[in-house]
């Protein structure tokens, strides 16, 4: 064999060994990534299972968002929309045995969002293009209303029991929203903020969590009233009732913030509207929904009483809402970004909401079993 052939074989062997090492390294890296993914999934499952257990559900959160929102992009008829809107009356509330325990596929909320967005754009054209200042109040109100009300319709559609009418939701939204603001204003008279806030208007960490505690308590008082009034023991109802009050609170608060910032801070109106709009998806709407579910979980079959505030289940969910609210209001950032902080808080709060929704659907199954047992006893 010539020296050239020997050299060629050596080069080939070295090349093959290099490829083998690269493949081994890639396989090792893939295995590590798979292990990390499995560990993260296991951690998520254990965490959601532990939280869900407080609400009566021993299963981990297993939700396919793509499937859940699959109806959003499909065409729907007016009759389909009407069927959703007429839910909750004596004639349209389904029997417990006819309720599905599967995850719902809401879609009407997206049409509500589109309708309000079109309205907002038309008002903006009136104000910006035609210099019509009469459109500005409408621009502020619709800007504040669009996301909270669309989100509220999501909770309305997700109420598998379909036992709360749109009329009751509107009452809770307007009356509950205003009175939750009023109760919050009363509670603020009994708290003292730091000198830093009093002098410069900036919140310390303690101030921020105090704001969360006061506002979630103010809303909780009104949520308790409506939960007891409707005499419900269903978690999905608690989510809807809480979301109704929270959405109303958010709309009136945001409208005030938009007006004050636009007039007093020299900030462009649209900037404030868009900021309040996209952040509303993770604010009062969902914090109050969690509190509403917590109230229902703690009270069980009777009305909510003062002693129920010491129930471990209520305290954990209520303080979770307070904590998320407090962190939201702090000057804390993640990697120097306040937007990233808000985004992470939105993800966390919706995970909690979906855990509670899962517990609510599990409750459907339990109530159906209770109903069947009662029917069997009657027949015996």
Feature map (PLM): residue ranges:
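Hydrophobic alpha-helical segments at protein termini of multi-pass membrane proteins
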Residues: 2-380
């Amino acid at each position: 064999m010539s020296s050239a052939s020997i050299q060629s074989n050596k080069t080939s062997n070295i090349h093959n060994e290099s490829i083998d090492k690269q493949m081994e390294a890639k396989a090792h890296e893939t295995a590590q990534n798979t292990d990390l993914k499995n560990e993260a999934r296991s951690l998520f499952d254990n965490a959601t299972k532990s939280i869900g257990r407080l609400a009566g559900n021993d299963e981990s959160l297993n939700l396919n968002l793509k499937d859940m929102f699959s109806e959003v992009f499909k065409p729907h008829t007016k009759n389909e929309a009407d069927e959703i809107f007429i839910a909750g009356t004596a004639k349209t509330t389904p029997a417990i045995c006819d309720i599905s325990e599967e995850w719902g596929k809401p879609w009407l909320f997206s049409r509500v969002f589109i309708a309000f967005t079109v309205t907002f754009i038309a008002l903006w054209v009136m104000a910006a293009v035609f210099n019509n200042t009469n459109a500005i109040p409408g621009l502020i109100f619709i800007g504040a209303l669009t996301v909270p009300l669309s989100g509220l319709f999501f909770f309305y559609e997700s109420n598998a029991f379909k036992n709360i009418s749109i009329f009751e939701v509107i009452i809770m939204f307007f009356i509950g929203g205003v009175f939750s603001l009023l109760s919050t204003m009363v509670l603020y008279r009994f708290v003292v903020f730091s000198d830093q806030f009093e002098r410069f208007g900036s919140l310390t960490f303690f101030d921020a969590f105090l704001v969360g505690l006061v506002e979630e308590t103010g809303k909780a008082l009104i949520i308790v009233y409506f939960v007891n009034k409707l005499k419900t023991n269903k978690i999905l109802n608690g989510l809807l009732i809480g979301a109704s009050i929270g959405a109303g609170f958010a709309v009136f608060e945001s409208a005030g913030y938009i007006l004050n910032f636009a007039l007093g801070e020299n900030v462009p109106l649209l900037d404030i509207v868009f900021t309040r709009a996209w952040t509303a998806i993770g604010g009062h709407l969902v914090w109050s929904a969690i509190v509403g579910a917590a109230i229902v979980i703690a009270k069980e079959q009777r009305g909510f009483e003062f002693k129920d505030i010491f129930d471990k289940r209520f305290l954990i969910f209520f303080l979770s809402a307070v904590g998320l609210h407090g962190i939201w209001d702090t000057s804390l950032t993640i990697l120097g970004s306040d937007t990233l902080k808000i985004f992470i808080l939105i993800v966390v709060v919706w995970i909690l909401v979906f855990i509670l929704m899962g517990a609510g659907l599990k409750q459907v199954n339990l109530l159906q079993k209770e109903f069947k047992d009662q029917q069997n006893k009657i027949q015996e």
